[in-house]
């Protein structure tokens, strides 16, 4: 099963692609979709949609895992990220890719065993779990990998529970 993990954002959208075979995870790719600050909102949202469709076409994920939004102090940022997240969910739905959503707490818990883990701890743990040569960066890409990993672990639980 190929899992596309996504860390929603407005200027930077992290993505991570993992293949899960049995209990093993294999890294396929990870990175960041960037949008230009010079572009107006509709152009930035279109850019997210186009780049995400390219990823879907390239990797053909079976399922997707998207990080849920959490509390933002800056309302304008929260609205922008919410708009970008809407484009992401719509794109995945149009491509008939099942969408699973996880809170930051669930993701941290699945990767490190501690729901309040710091970003550095998550990155170091991912490096070990995925047998990477270097720590995954930037944060957005690492968060997306963690989201995909979380889904892979929860997916096993879903299967064992008969879902």
Curated annotation (Swiss-Prot):
Known function: The RuvA-RuvB-RuvC complex processes Holliday junction (HJ) DNA during genetic recombination and DNA repair. Endonuclease that resolves HJ intermediates. Cleaves cruciform DNA by making single-stranded nicks across the HJ at symmetrical positions within the homologous arms, yielding a 5'-phosphate and a 3'-hydroxyl group; requires a central core of homology in the junction. The consensus cleavage sequence is 5'-(A/T)TT(C/G)-3'. Cleavage occurs on the 3'-side of the TT dinucleotide at the point of strand exchange.
Database matches in SUPFAM superfamilies: Ribonuclease H-like
HAMAP family for the chain: RuvC
Keyword Transmembrane helix: no
Key word Hydrolase present: yes
This protein's name: Crossover junction endodeoxyribonuclease RuvC
Molecular function in Gene Ontology: crossover junction DNA endonuclease activity; DNA binding; magnesium ion binding
């Amino acid at each position: 099963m190929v899992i596309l993990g996504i860390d929603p954002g407005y200027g930077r959208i992290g993505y991570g692609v993992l293949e899960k075979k049995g209990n093993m995870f294999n890294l396929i790719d990870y990175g960041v979709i960037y949008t230009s600050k010079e572009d107006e909102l509709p152009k930035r949202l279109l850019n997210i949609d186009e780049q995400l469709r390219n990823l879907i076409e390239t990797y053909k994920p079976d399922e997707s895992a998207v990080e849920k939004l959490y509390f933002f102090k800056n309302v304008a940022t929260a609205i922008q990220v919410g708009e970008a997240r809407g484009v992401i969910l719509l794109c995945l739905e149009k491509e008939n890719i099942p969408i699973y959503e996880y809170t930051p707490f669930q993701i941290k818990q699945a990767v490190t065993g501690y729901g309040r883990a710091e970003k550095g701890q998550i990155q170091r743990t991912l490096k070990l779990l995925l047998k990477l040569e270097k720590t995954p960066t930037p944060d957005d890409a690492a968060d997306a990998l963690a989201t995909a990993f979380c889904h892979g672990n929860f997916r096993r639980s879903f299967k064992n529970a008969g879902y």
